[in-house]
């Protein structure tokens, strides 16, 4: 069992308080054309509104593949969890059949990478609130280079074909970190434009040129590769910074993006 790491800090540990917050942040408008998204993973008080706007658009799916960055350094470089995940709202099963269908060229089963990582966990209560009868596939990226992102996307596509699952991919990432609000917004707009272009090489060039402190940049690239393979286009749903609710001298940016076919 993968127990919650950040319940009581990033989001309420009390189920009723958590449900009240999720009700406030979501406006369900499920869109069957959405196949993937970028959703932030900070504390809900900071990024919950942006995350909620994204999650509100996600259609029901059999399997939500959540790809998040490894902030801790623990575990394997590209780690897939197969444990049941627990949140204050209950248990969520991992789609082990989907995991077994992944070729494991670059991914590997590993729980250690997930044990203390928050980036995937904070997406799960949104899914529990908005959807019934689903499973997840949590993938934690310690490596985020372009080749890794492409290979992870290919493994997801392969497993999707072999299992016939209806899949939605969630890239969990914040944008730039710890900059003055105006500068954060300026740099984030450049990165967001690169994402919306659906040109992964241009996107990586932008990340490296800016030395961008986008924690899940490779996770975003997985969603881009996956979506590009299906002929999808990207759309910015919402953008905010922590400066909207806290000090503006050092902020973190949050982009909500969906990929539609």
UniProtKB/Swiss-Prot annotation:
SUPFAM superfamilies referenced in this protein's UniProt entry, alphabetically: LigB-like (SSF53213)
Entry superkingdom: Archaea
Gene3D superfamilies assigned: LigB-like (3.40.830.10)
Record-linked InterPro entries: MEMO1_fam
Family in the record: Belongs to the MEMO1 family.
The protein's name in its UniProt record: MEMO1 family protein AF_2310
Protein species of origin: Archaeoglobus fulgidus (strain ATCC 49558 / DSM 4304 / JCM 9628 / NBRC 100126 / VC-16)
């Amino acid at each position: 069992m993968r127990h919650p790491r950040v319940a009581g800090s990033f989001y309420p540990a009390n189920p009723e308080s958590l449900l009240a917050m999720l009700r406030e942040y979501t406006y369900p408008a499920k869109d069957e054309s959405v196949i993937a998204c970028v959703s932030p993973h900070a504390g809900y008080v900071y990024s919950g509104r942006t995350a909620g706007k994204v999650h509100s658009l996600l259609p029901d799916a059999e399997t939500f593949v959540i790809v998040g960055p490894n902030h801790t350094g623990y575990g394997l470089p590209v780690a897939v969890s197969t444990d049941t995940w627990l949140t204050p709202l209950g248990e969520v099963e991992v789609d082990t059949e989907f995991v077994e269908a992944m070729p494991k060229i670059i991914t590997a089963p590993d729980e250690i990478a997930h044990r203390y990582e928050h980036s995937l966990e904070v997406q799960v209560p949104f899914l529990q609130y908005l959807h019934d009868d689903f499973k997840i596939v949590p993938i934690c990226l310690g490596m985020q280079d372009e080749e890794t992102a492409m290979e992870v996307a290919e493994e997801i596509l392969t497993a999707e074909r072999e299992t016939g699952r209806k899949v939605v991919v969630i890239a969990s990432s914040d944008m730039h970190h710890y900059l003055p609000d105006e500068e954060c917004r300026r740099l984030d707009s450049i990165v967001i434009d690169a994402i919306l272009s659906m040109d992964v090489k241009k996107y990586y060039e932008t990340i490296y040129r800016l030395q961008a402190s986008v924690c899940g940049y490779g996770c975003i690239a997985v969603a881009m590769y996956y979506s590009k393979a299906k002929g999808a286009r990207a759309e910015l749903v919402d953008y905010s910074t922590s400066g909207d609710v806290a000090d503006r001298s050092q902020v973190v940016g949050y982009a909500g993006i969906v990929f539609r076919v």
